């Protein structure tokens, strides 16, 4: 029994047997290798020496994989800080787009196409409805983030959209709907359903879909048609969460959710020779936390379901935040609303300065005497220092 275990420990214990008995994609295999070898020396080391006392320190490089639980904090802080320049001190709304669970096998079997279709359907829904004079009649600003997991690491693909509560009309005048979201949820639901199903049907008609694993039955024409009819008939349930209270609330949310992975180390509670216990929210019981125990191989299977396709972009910016509009349009919105400009704190800082600012830790100071630490030349990195010389 191991109480203080990490996801890396779980992979070391259970991944080899899982790999030998399961089909694994190249992206999943790469992520597993990175997680198991992060900060072990497999990705190189940096050796530094104190100018004053000669004490040496060895730093093992991280894997920098976006699925690794040990590698998210630093890129997250830099990304969120850069977004400060894009966020206005104005109301924002949080819209979540979900799909019927009947589609999950097809989506998992065609991740690149059908994740992309989620972005297309969500963004087209928001942009087209916002541009309609019946609702707002403007170009708006929003960020879409794909998550593929539920609290138990089940497969649950959905889009989080952070939507500015107003926009610019054709004359570049600002329009908003006060504190209320400017789009009816029922209209969003029907529009999103129509757009997603239309793209799914088009991919099917163009013979672009694959049917693996639990999606295999849908190779049959009539079974697939029945699935389409079932999903068309269902009421899709996107929902709008409580609005954000200004720019800082948006930034805090982005910091919490943008670089999330399926599960983090603090939720791992126990590991035995054959099982893993982790905490999860029970949404059938008012979102209270509970502990779940599953086999080690099942834990690996669930975790790897959420490794995105190679080079797949999970965070996307639209309309006023698109690269061709952002510099001019966001500045115009800021001037109209009288918002102060948020300046990036980390933009021109090097890594030691960022670590010093965020974590109050000076990695250029010797932990023994406080002297200045300097890096050793690369060719000396693999000269193992004697134990008494280590800080």
Language-model-derived ranges and their functions:
Residues 1-391:
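Beta->alpha loop/short-helix hinge microenvironment recognizer with preference
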